[in-house]
Amino acid sequence: PCRLPLPGVVIFVHGVNSDGEWYDAAEQGLCEGLNTRLARQAAQLALPGDGTGRLIPCAYTPELDAAGFIDPDRSHANFIQPQPHWSPVIHFRWGYKATKRDVKTFGDSVFLNEDDYWGGGPFANGCSALADLWTDGLNDRLFLWLTAQHLNPVPGREVYHCPHRAYYAFAALRLARLLKSIRDKQADCPITVVCHSQGNMVGLAAAFLADRLGIQADNYVLCNPPLSLVDKNGTEDWVQRYTTNGAGQSGRVSHGARLDTLANFFKLLKARAGCEPPAERVDQCMANPQPADGSPGFTAASDRQQWGLDGRHTHGRVTLYCNPHDQVISADSVQGIGWRGMSADEIAKTGGAGVFAQRVFAHAYPVGAAGGKDYDFWAERNKRDPDPYPGSFWIPPSPPAHYALQQGVTSNQSVVGKVLSVLSAPFFIVATGAVKARVNADPRTGWKIPINAPALPESFLPEARHYGEALKEFDASFDPAGKARNRNRANAPPDDPYTQHGVHRTRDGRDSDAPLGNEHTEAQLRYEHRAQLRMKARRQGKAEADGSVPGETQGGSASADYQAWRTGEIRQMLKDCVNAHATDHSSILTNPMHAEKALAYDVAIGVCTLSEQDWRELRVEADWRYCFKGLPETHPHYYLGEYFSSGFMAKQPLEEWVKSGEARRPAGIVDTRTYARPEPGAAS
């Protein structure tokens, strides 16, 4: 029998400091939810078996070995497991690749693996406006000798100077080119782009670059985006004071430019509503109006009426998933819409009517109930009973910035800076203790956002999932790094620092960092620690002249002194993170239940006719590591593999290459900034 076609393509786009840790869970849930939406559950189909069109996730081979190194045998030829699959999902992978020169310049400031790259790039180099994707990276200098690390209270999130953000613009171009590859294979294929965190900035920028190519995706789902619409932000203005545009303006991207850019994005997607295929064609290929088990079936018309925006269409839609508990993009210098959502006024000012919808994922608040209600941030927060932290919006309370002498000394590369860090410590310790500026912003008093996404077939309370277990509270408290250790590990060597660390309780006594993970989560922890150790080793003079760190290289030999230092550092990193706050930043997408019950109803539905060979080629193209080796040289996008291979494009530094040609900033991404260019002769 002929297999029922897939309903379209869904592209996942991860954020910074990430290799798509949510991809597998979200794909699993999405496939299950689409089986329900399309009436393809086993009991609903007349014919048994997986070959009838029931959606099955695509499985991928592990990327790391147990020691936390990249598996050298993994390649474009075997990164997809051979087991049967029938999935609409493509995993888009992107990041920062350091040249040999970059390793010497930035290797002591950013995480890099043994091949000198990092998925999503450094955590500290995120941004809150699309125009910033074409600017210099973070400048960690606050004032004279003071750096961001002097005041950073979050362990494991070192903030140092970062490389140019051109790798974001390059990733956006690759995503736009991937959209073109799909459209070239099937012009009317439904495409939904699902973005998380900083991946939203890549995804939105790709929409503008795709428009330049004459193509576009049909739907976007924006999860936890850092895109900020707050009118004023003095903290971000100060951080961005050295950032300039072509007109010589400096500082934060202006409020008006942010609104105009988002309005331009909405216009691009709104135009896709008219590209939905005729209902008759969808029904001819996919209808199941009377399932075998007597349950409600699927027809295009009923699907659009129930789950389409305004009961009309499943194309031409942007859906925002925001989380009021997100402790990453609620940072005072960011305040993204993935935390605070969009108010009715902001929706109106950006022309969101008829294209924009939003869902709130919050503790004890049902997702998918009938729309027309407002989510009141403070009112919902004050419903907590019992309330462990009365008066604080954040649970636990947001950590206050405080003067950290050791961090400040480490962050300064000059002797003068180190000396001044010590001499000024008494003053700044008292001053920061008195000010008690918090890392995370609070919502404005009375802040409300409308919940206007279509009702779901089954509303549900969101659940955070850690190490395969559902948590009682969606707004989690602590998330110690040590939990990622393998709970079933046996025969660990006695000198292993992950074993030596033991078990430590959190400061509230309610939790601990006892191992809850498996071999994969521990491998990921070791992988991240190796990157952190490389950075520390370069900063402390323990690296080779070329920046390499033999003790963190597969097959490399470490001296006894380095091994002792390494063991001490790992134990300290684990200890420092015992009281790490749960970020609640990936909670929406790491639970497959959320994708099954919500995401599956927010994607565009149509008929996808891509062949199995098409799917494999597209999945190879979507992974920046495999373009050169996995695509034929005749492929129109083969050339994009140069960046991962060398750190250059057209043999130019990436920041030079993106200034002109296909990767230049589109005019629809507006770049006006807070401070005007100084007049000639003006006093400085």
Across the structure, where does each feature detected by a protein language model lie?
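Active-site catalytic motif of lipid deacylating hydrolases and related acyltransferases
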Residues: 13-21, 29-31, 45-187
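Alpha/beta-hydrolase-fold catalytic nucleophile elbow
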Residues: 95, 223-224, 321
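A conserved short beta-strand
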Residues: 213-232
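Terminal low-complexity/disordered tails
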Residues: 1-28, 56-63, 206, 228-233, ...
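Active-site catalytic pocket residues across diverse enzymes, especially alpha/beta-hydrolases
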Residues: 34, 38, 210-213
